[in-house]
Regions:
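A broad, low-amplitude sensor of folded, mature protein cores
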Residues: 1-14, 18, 152, 167, ...
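Extended amphipathic alpha-helical interaction segments
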Residues: 85, 89-197
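Generic alpha-helical secondary structure signal
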Residues: 18, 110, 117, 216-217
Length: 221
């Protein structure tokens, strides 16, 4: 096991109970270190007991919180629907006045999510989680167990991978928002070549229509 030696090094195996709990915590920690935390489900079931369960729960909840940040950025990506954004109902006098505010909102939200993620993979934040946990007897021992797992090189690599996934998802979002802004600019600059009829954008110039759908395809690709 990846962590078994390290965990034993900070343990005091004075009873069968402690050995069993440490083995289980090690097993669960190794699973988290080896799995794809972004694309695979994090098993939040707590298999240990007493103070060990607090350590296990803190580890799993911490990783889940980071993953949830990634999922929030992905949700923003999925909510960019060009057909809705540039629907006839949003067109007014050849302009789409609500687009700029949507772009700014999504940029700001995604920036905040990325900043949260970067903060969570810092050592101070990682340790704050266990220091705030309701550990009672032999707190230093259980904090050391948590520290051995969460500050290990293997877990640091996992955290960096998660942060990279959040950053990549945000970059993808920014690219989409740039295209949305470009479509808005294109439609407004060529407003004389389209109008609204029966809740649809109707183009009067074939070349402009083709260019518009090319931009839409770029957004959806």
């Amino acid at each position: 096991s990846i962590l078994i030696v390290a965990l034993i090094a900070v343990s005091f195996l004075y009873s069968k109970f402690n050995k069993t709990q440490l083995d289980t915590l090690t097993e669960e920690s190794n699973k988290l270190i080896q799995q794809d935390l972004i694309n695979e489900e994090i098993n939040e079931e707590i298999r240990t007991q007493k103070e060990y369960a607090i350590v296990e729960k803190t580890i799993k909840e911490y990783l889940t919180n980071i993953k949830n940040i990634y999922l929030e950025v992905e949700k923003l990506n999925s909510q960019i629907n060009a057909e809705e954004i540039f629907s006839a109902s949003n067109a007014e006098d050849g302009k789409f006045n609500n687009v700029d505010s949507l772009v700014d909102e999504y940029k700001e939200k995604s920036k905040e999510y990325l900043e949260q993620c970067i903060s969570l993979i810092e050592e101070d934040s990682i340790m704050e989680a266990i220091n705030n946990a309701e550990l009672t007897a032999k707190k230093d021992y259980y904090v050391d167990l948590y520290k051995t797992v969460m500050l290990s090189d293997s877990m640091k690599n996992q955290l960096l991978k998660m942060e990279e996934s959040v950053e990549k998802s945000r970059d993808n979002l920014i690219d989409k928002l740039t295209i949305v802004s470009n479509i808005k600019k294109f439609l407004e600059e060529n407003s004389r070549y389209w109008n609204v009829k029966d809740d649809q954008l109707i183009f009067t110039n074939t070349n402009i229509m083709v260019q518009y759908y090319e931009l839409l395809n770029e957004l959806n690709s």
